[in-house]
Every structure is written in C-alpha cells, then in structure tokens.
C-alpha cells in the first residue's frame, strides 16, 4: 500500500531552500571604522626619502555578533615606517564588514576569523596604499596575510 504524506508549509519552505540555498556568506557592508595617518617629521622627512622605509606591520582580527546571524568583522592594522632612524609615518586602520552567515555552528569561528578577513583584506590594503600615497609617501604594498596561521596561533594562545 502506498502512503501519501502532505508537507507542511514549513517543510515546503525548507525543501525549497535545498533547491535555492541561501548563500553561506553575504557581505552587507564594508566600512572604515578608524583611519589615522601621522607624519611627525613632515615636511623635512620627505628630503630623506632616498631609500625604501623599514615598515613594521601588526594585524589583528576581531569578530562580534550583532544579532541573529549578523556579525561585524574587523581587521586592525598598526603600521610604523622608519627611515634613517627617524619615524616616517604611523598609520592605523580599522576596516570592518557587516556580514550575514548561514553556516553550521562548528564552522562559525573559522569563517569569521579566516574567510571574512580574506574577503575584506584587499579592500583594506587598498585603503592603506591610497592613504600613504595621498600623504605624500611612496606606495607600500602589504603582502597577503596568512589568516589560517593567525587563527591557529590565536587558538594556541591562552
């Protein structure tokens, strides 16, 4: 004997989602939360720009739950540039994105601390490069960042 089952509206919606799944990651907006460029020895320091500056970069990732499945992910950059033992520049940037996530709970942390930073990094790098150039400094290209290694190091640090 055949049995017929009638699907509830909720089951039909869920079945429809299998054919038309929601994207796992949706970036709602990206924005500059904080941006600061200081050139303490300007304009005299520009005469000393005969060689590439020594640049130190510190990068951090932070994620906060906003509500439901919405999160704010921030990349924080602190950069110091020195030339001939003088401070050339100090740049700080916090670049953020508001994202909606449709991922299983066990994948949430890696997505927030690895995948979203990978997505927004090129935009943050562009802001930094443009800021330095507009500040009268030579362009500086930040190499890609290994967010997987950062995540693993973060997990090991108590």
Regions found by a protein language model. Give the residues of each.
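N-terminal intrinsically disordered, cationic/polar leader segments
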Residues: 5-119, 123-158
């Amino acid at each position: 004997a055949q049995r017929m089952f009638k699907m509830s509206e909720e089951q039909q919606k869920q079945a429809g989602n299998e054919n038309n799944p929601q994207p796992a990651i949706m970036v709602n907006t990206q924005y500059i939360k904080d941006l600061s460029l200081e050139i303490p020895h300007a304009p005299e320091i520009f005469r000393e720009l005969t060689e590439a500056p020594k640049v130190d970069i510190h990068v951090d990732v932070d994620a906060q739950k906003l509500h439901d499945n919405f999160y704010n992910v921030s990349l924080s950059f602190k950069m110091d540039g020195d030339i001939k033992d003088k401070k050339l520049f100090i740049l700080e940037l916090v670049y953020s994105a508001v994202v909606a996530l449709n991922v299983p709970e066990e994948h949430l942390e890696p997505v927030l601390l690895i995948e979203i930073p990978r997505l927004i990094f090129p935009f943050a790098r562009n802001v930094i490069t443009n800021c330095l150039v507009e500040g009268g400094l030579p362009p500086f290209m930040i190499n890609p960042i290994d967010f997987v290694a950062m995540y693993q190091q973060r997990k090991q640090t108590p």
